[in-house]
């Protein structure tokens, strides 16, 4: 059975690119913001990995990361953060909260796939 990845990004084009590169090896679900992600998790869904943009309307990705890492049921799920901002302080802040990786947009989709495979070995 394929491992499940949840993508949180308000840009559908980014989600589609990620899905194209990941769907051959993983079951991919896309939602447009962190609040939808919270609702999806609370409905009983548990992905093996979450890839989340930071800047989204509604619940931002950094707020979602804080929520998930404070929630006993979900804190074990690894989260990769995506950002258009190449900021050392932002990267360090998110890694301290509990992100397993921080990838700057634009990114190479193949590189992201390699990073995902390191986190979710098959």
Model feature map: region roles:
Residues 31-37, 91, 109:
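Conserved Asp/Asn-Gly motif in the active-site loop of CheY-like receiver
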Residues 32-49:
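Acidic, metal-coordinating helix/loop segments flanking the phosphotransfer/catalytic sites
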Residues 107-116:
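C-terminal output helix
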């Amino acid at each position: 059975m394929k491992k499940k990845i949840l993508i949180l990004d308000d840009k559908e084009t980014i989600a589609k690119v990620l899905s194209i590169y990941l769907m051959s090896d993983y079951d991919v679900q896309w939602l447009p913001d962190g609040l939808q992600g919270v609702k999806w998790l609370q409905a009983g869904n548990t992905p093996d990995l979450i890839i989340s943009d930071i800047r989204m309307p509604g619940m931002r990705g950094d707020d979602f990361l804080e929520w998930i890492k404070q929630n006993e049921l979900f804190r074990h799920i690894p989260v990769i953060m995506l950002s258009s901002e190449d900021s050392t302080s932002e990267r360090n802040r998110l890694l301290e909260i509990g992100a397993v990786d921080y990838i700057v947009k634009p990114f190479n989709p193949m590189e992201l796939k390699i990073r995902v495979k390191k986190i979710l070995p098959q």
